[in-house]
Curated annotation (Swiss-Prot):
Subcellular location as annotated: Mitochondrion outer membrane; Mitochondrion
Family of the protein in this entry: Belongs to the metaxin family.
Subunit details: Interacts with MTX1/metaxin-1. Associates with the mitochondrial contact site and cristae organizing system (MICOS) complex, composed of at least MICOS10/MIC10, CHCHD3/MIC19, CHCHD6/MIC25, APOOL/MIC27, IMMT/MIC60, APOO/MIC23/MIC26 and QIL1/MIC13. This complex was also known under the names MINOS or MitOS complex. The MICOS complex associates with mitochondrial outer membrane proteins SAMM50, MTX1 and MTX2 (together described as components of the mitochondrial outer membrane sorting assembly machinery (SAM) complex) and DNAJC11, mitochondrial inner membrane protein TMEM11 and with HSPA9.
PTM sites of type N-acetylserine: S2
Species of the source: Sus scrofa (Pig)
Function: Involved in transport of proteins into the mitochondrion.
Pfam families registered for this protein in UniProt: GST_C_6 (PF17171), Tom37 (PF10568)
InterPro entries in alphabetical order: Glutathione-S-Trfase_C_sf (IPR036282), Glutathione_S-Trfase (IPR040079), Metaxin_GST (IPR033468), Mito_Protein_Transport_Metaxin (IPR050931), Sam37/metaxin_N (IPR019564)
Protein name (database record): Metaxin-2
Amino acid sequence: MSLVAEAFVSQIAAAEPWPENATLYQQLKGEQILLSDNAASLAVQAFLQMCNLPIKVVCRANAEYMSPSGKVPFIHVGNQVVSELGPIVQFVKAKGHSLSDGLDEVQKAEMKAYMELVNNMLLTAELYLQWCDEATVGEITHARYGSPYPWPLNHILAYQKQWEVKRKMKAIGWGNKTLDQVLEDVDQCCQALSQRLGTQPYFFNKQPTELDALVFGHLYTILTTQLTNDELSEKVKNYSNLLAFCRRIEQHYFEDHSKGSSSVRLS
């Protein structure tokens, strides 16, 4: 999209208030969605909750194929469809809602750097575990990913996705990593996040930003997703301030909000 087109879209978005029927789409929660997509969806839900913007979560078996980018989650707001956290943050900002406007330029650069760290380490580790760890692939991933579809389409789609992810892993230098090396990367990422958070309630003191939403989405999902073993979640559990951080956001933005609305609730 050209800069002129982007500016035009932003003007249109800004002119329309946030509707009550805004919808977020993801895969089927109980039997289909995988760790990485669940984390991405939860990050967007947390971000919108932090902005105090209502959103209804709708689960569709074909959500990945409905998305304009082929990735979930995506939101349908008025006549606009936007996918993934980064573009959604910009879309929401165009409507006058921002969590990071109070940061100075140095802080904004630091926030973006930590968001890159999460995407480069945690998200990539989740994808590796789902599609490159043979035990997880055999016991969880293929069955869940293909669950809405009849044989042989369920197997075809799962193998196609696995091939795509493995090709990506090779391209970024993760193709020959062992599971232990990936878990060490996760530990280093958690250590960096833990040190940055310190004793603060959020990464930039008292108010959450999109970084907090992103970190919460991934850490909470890692902590609450049953895998073939607990090695991944144990890495997060080593950092008590990250556990307290997840619980704080869960209580404030999901449990408290769910008392007045059934649209978002964590299991």
